[in-house]
Curated annotation (Swiss-Prot):
Keywords: DNA-binding, Metal-binding, Nucleus, Receptor, Transcription, Transcription regulation, Zinc, Zinc-finger
Compositionally biased region (Polar residues): 115-124
Subunit structure: Heterodimer; with a RXR molecule. Binds DNA preferentially as a RAR/RXR heterodimer.
Protein name stated in the entry: Retinoic acid receptor gamma
DNA-binding region(s) in UniProt: 143-208
UniProt free text on domains: Composed of three domains: a modulating N-terminal domain, a DNA-binding domain and a C-terminal ligand-binding domain.
CDD domains: NR_DBD_RAR, NR_LBD_RAR
């Protein structure tokens, strides 16, 4: 048996235990101050007792040091528990923390934090803290470029979604813009689309980073490479044949930009005027040739000749301007901001305005820029042109159901071809179809422009343009007959006492 004498106190100096000696049978006596441990113990037990005594010695020493911090006697810190505290938790927490209530209010910060932490972590009943309120929504400064509402920090500055996308596209495609004024245009949320040159310059001025765009592009490319494409698009032989026929019809009636010998003219290249007659005559001549090629393209489309003559004419009149605009916009060169016609004539934006496009100019150039991300090849352009032409929702059709049946394989062919060409971009097909809606909007404005244009030109509108692009009723007041050279594309029949009438081409 071991005897424990607890008459010792930390105030006695906290002496270390001493082993007085061993008797027979392995009896040993340990002394620590006035405490004595006697009994039959082995080496392991003696070591355990010594460790306990050493720990008690360290606690007593700590208590003495703490008492000297603020003048409290060691008895206030019950680290060395007295006999009546055995079996109770430290500081008698189950008693309501009476020991802490006895402390003065001016405890050192270290002791105050210790007491709070001990209470919160030792209590059996935890009081849940009230949920913190949600953080307020982040408010960004207005767009540094156009002062519109900002969506966050993009490429180094606070900017709106519009300016972010414009800057990204401009850098990724190495766009070169031209200012048609004094290169000092005001850029705000109303005027930001009027001058791309000044808008891009302001992006640089406010601190947008080219390098940030390149890093973002590389990251997206890496993500695309990691995608696994599981869809397979099988193409039956009859669809392959359809695609080849449409592609061949397009290429043989519309040479690509790389096949043309481009040339330019200096006529009114620097400033806008209401109408440059020299450019207008050249443009009307080229437009007439282009219309003839579109008619030839339509006749070579599979199934088009099976429609009634009336439906063929209706479809051509309705879609001719759509296809004309689509074709010229595919010959847009963003670096020089120019468009090239079928004979190689290349006009800049100002010259296109002066040639007769007028207020339609910026709308046409904006559409051309929207086509660039689609990266359509000749086959896709031909299929999209055919879909524009053979469309059952045109007014005054005799057999709209038959037209819809002819359009269905064209839609399927474009979908499969586009997805096979871009396996990682299945969204390209619907984006191409959406361009048909844009083309129709441009055609509507083009018809309005033709009516005002006839008031600006000195003579009559060229007959084929009048027949295919405009409403003939709008030109009934034209008194002078057109020159014979301009009547070649269509057949006319004149009778005495009757107005000149046109027959089907």
């Amino acid at each position: 048996m071991m005897k424990f004498s607890d008459t010792a106190s930390c105030r006695d100096g906290g002496e270390r235990p001493e082993e007085e000696g061993k008797g027979a049978g392995g009896r040993s006596k340990l002394r620590m101050g006035k405490e004595e441990f006697t009994g039959s113990v082995g080496k392991e037990e003696a070591a355990a007792v010594a460790s306990m005594s050493s720990s008690k010695d360290r606690i007593c020493s700590t208590s003495t040091q703490l008492s000297q911090l603020h003048g409290f006697p060691p008895s206030m810190y019950p680290f060395a528990f007295s006999s009546n505290m055995r079996g109770s938790p430290p500081f008698d927490l189950t008693n309501g923390g009476a020991y802490f209530r006895s402390f003065p209010t001016d405890l050192p910060k270290e002791m105050a934090s210790l007491s709070v932490e001990t209470q919160s972590t030792s209590s059996e009943e935890m009081v849940p803290s009230s949920p913190s309120p949600p953080p307020p929504p982040r408010v960004y400064k207005p767009c540094f470029v156009c002062n519109d509402k900002s969506s966050g920090y993009h490429y180094g500055v606070s900017s709106c979604e519009g300016c972010k996308g414009f800057f990204r596209r401009s850098i990724q495609k190495n766009m070169v813009y031209t200012c048609h004024r004094d290169k000092n245009c005001q850029i705000n949320k109303v005027t930001r689309n009027r001058c791309q040159y000044c808008r891009l310059q302001k992006c640089f001025e406010v601190g947008m980073s080219k390098e940030a765009v390149r890093n973002d592009r590389n990251k997206k490319k890496k993500e695309i490479k990691e995608e696994v494409v599981t869809d397979s698009y099988e193409m039956p032989p009859e669809m392959e044949a359809l695609i080849q026929k449409v592609s061949k019809a397009h290429q043989e009636t519309f040479p690509s930009l790389c096949q043309l010998g481009k040339y330019t003219t200096n006529s009114s290249a620097d400033h806008r005027v209401q109408l440059d007659l020299g450019l207008w005559h050249k443009f009307s001549e080229l437009a007439t040739k282009c219309i003839i090629k579109i008619v030839e393209f339509a006749k070579r489309l599979p199934g088009f000749a099976t429609l009634t003559i009336a439906d063929q004419i209706t479809l051509l009149k309705a879609a001719c301007l759509d296809i004309l605009m689509l074709r010229i916009c595919t010959r847009y060169t963003p670096e020089q901001d120019t468009m090239t016609f079928s004979d190689g004539l290349t006009l800049n934006r100002t010259q296109m305005h002066n040639a007769g496009f007028g207020p339609l100019t910026d709308l046409v150039f904006a559409f051309a820029e929207q086509l660039l991300p689609l990266e359509m090849d000749d086959t896709e352009t031909g299929l999209l042109s055919a879909i524009c032409l053979i469309c059952g929702d045109r007014m005054d059709l005799e057999e709209p159901e038959k037209v819809d049946k002819l359009q269905e394989p064209l839609l399927e062919a474009l979908k499969i071809y586009a997805r096979r060409r871009r396996p990682n971009k299945p969204y390209m097909f619907p984006r191409m179809l959406m361009k048909i809606t844009d083309l129709r909007g441009i055609s509507t404005k083009g018809a309005e422009r033709a009516i005002t244009l006839k008031m600006e030109i000195p003579g009559p509108m060229p007959p084929l343009i009048r027949e295919m692009l405009e409403n003939p009723e709008a030109f009934e007041d034209d008194a002078s007959p057109p020159p014979k050279s301009e009547q070649k594309p269509i057949k006319v029949e004149e009778k005495p006492g009757e107005k000149t009438s046109t027959k089907d081409p």
